[in-house]
Amino acid sequence: MTLQNFYRDTWAEINLDAIFENAANMKKHLPPEITLFAVVKANAYGHGDVEVAETAIQAGAGYLAVAFLDEALALRKKGITAPILVLGASRPEDAQIAARESITLTVFQAGWLEAAQSFLEGTVLTIHLKCDSGMGRIGIRKQEEMNEIERFLQKTKCFVLEGIFTHFATADQLDTEYFSKQLARFEEMLTWLKEKPKYVHAANSAALLRFPNAVFNSVRMGISLYGLSPSMEMKEVLPFALRPAFSLKTKLVHVKNISKGQSVSYGATYTAEEDTWIGTLPIGYADGWIRMLQGQEVLLEGGRSPLVGRICMDQCMVKLSREFPVGTEVTLIGKNGTECITVDDIAEKLNTINYEVTCMISSRVPRMYLKDGRITGVVNQLI
């Protein structure tokens, strides 16, 4: 495999076939009339926004979703023409640019609509209403709020109400009591509207995988699009296998033998108990490979070796079982021979969730895109 467009031997590999397969399998899992929203916020959970967006659309997604307007505008600038929903709050003064770029905004206050109207200047903005059914984040909570919004929309032609949605807080937990309360609350909220809009969506990855009765007519596919389970609890109850798309790799840039009693890295936290081969890897906490990963195993030629000493900003060190040549490929996340380190393994080490692991691999790390076993593109945001 030839490395292209970057000058440090550290990169992430994104398997677009896996993205396609996950989206296509989800489409098969759902009734054919359901619209799939592919969630590509946070640079597609660290996988690459435009590449994932294009692949998801090819697999049958009918809509894209991002966190804030900047992310939507970035997709437009990169040539994405599919509908895009901004899930988070936006400023009223930015309504015009959203309307001009055919970007759908989330709304949950009549006052926001009134303020945004003055900025639209004849353009029409498509909106989805957000309901807070129990997440406690943003959204309409009371019927009076919904009625006030509906009355305002009836007297203006500046807005098109296209959708309404909520977000489940506990759909990834086996205990369904709170989920059921939220679902019932959202169903009640839907009765507050005189007429339902085109899209009604509540199900995130966890809900759409587990609760087909909660999908309404649209769903938002986030973490499962990337081949990752919404939670460790859910891994055993998935209706179909998810295929992880993310791998993280580097290469040995230096190999040396240190004597018994010699130490490695800041703080001298690792001291060799015997003569030991040490390799240096060009990845560190500025790349998202944070200091808490000291002691984590990596894969070389199908075997496991631990990281020793503190992880530095740009480099870290690995204890080798023998002398390996400089340039040997090292897998931090992914498969190497018969061994595999998963995103979930790293999340467990860090006492966090798989979402955070892929999101925290920084823009310093180039993304290499693979399709049919071939490199189809490399994105290096530094150059």
From Swiss-Prot:
Q: Name one GO biological process term.
A: peptidoglycan biosynthetic process
According to UniProt, this protein's pathway is: Amino-acid biosynthesis; D-alanine biosynthesis; D-alanine from L-alanine: step 1/1
Q: How does activity depend on pH?
A: Optimum pH is 8-10.
Entry keyword set: Isomerase, Pyridoxal phosphate
Listed SUPFAM superfamilies: Alanine racemase C-terminal domain-like (SSF50621), PLP-binding barrel (SSF51419)
Q: Which residues form the active site?
A: 41, 266
Does the keyword Isomerase belong to this entry?
yes
Gene3D superfamilies the record matches: Alanine racemase (3.20.20.10), Lyase, Ornithine Decarboxylase, Chain A, domain 1 (2.40.37.10)
Q: How does activity depend on temperature?
A: Highly active at low temperatures, even at 0 degree Celsius. Thermolabile.
Enzymatic reactions: L-alanine = D-alanine
User: Does Isomerase show up as a keyword for this record?
Assistant: yes
Q: What are its GO cellular component terms?
A: cytosol
In short, the EC number is: 5.1.1.1
The record's listing under PROSITE patterns reads: ALANINE_RACEMASE
Extract the GO molecular function terms from the UniProt entry.
alanine racemase activity; pyridoxal phosphate binding
Q: Which InterPro entries match?
A: Ala_racemase, Ala_racemase/Decarboxylase_C, Ala_racemase_C, Ala_racemase_N, Ala_racemase_pyridoxalP-BS, PLP-binding_barrel
Positions of modified residues (N6-(pyridoxal phosphate)lysine): 41
Residues that hold substrate according to the record: 137, 313
What is the required cofactor set for this protein?
A: pyridoxal 5'-phosphate
Function noted in UniProt: Catalyzes the interconversion of L-alanine and D-alanine. Does not act on other amino acids.
The family this protein is said to belong to: Belongs to the alanine racemase family.
Q: How does it assemble?
A: Homodimer.
Report the protein name in the record: Alanine racemase
Name of the gene encoding the protein in the UniProt record: alr
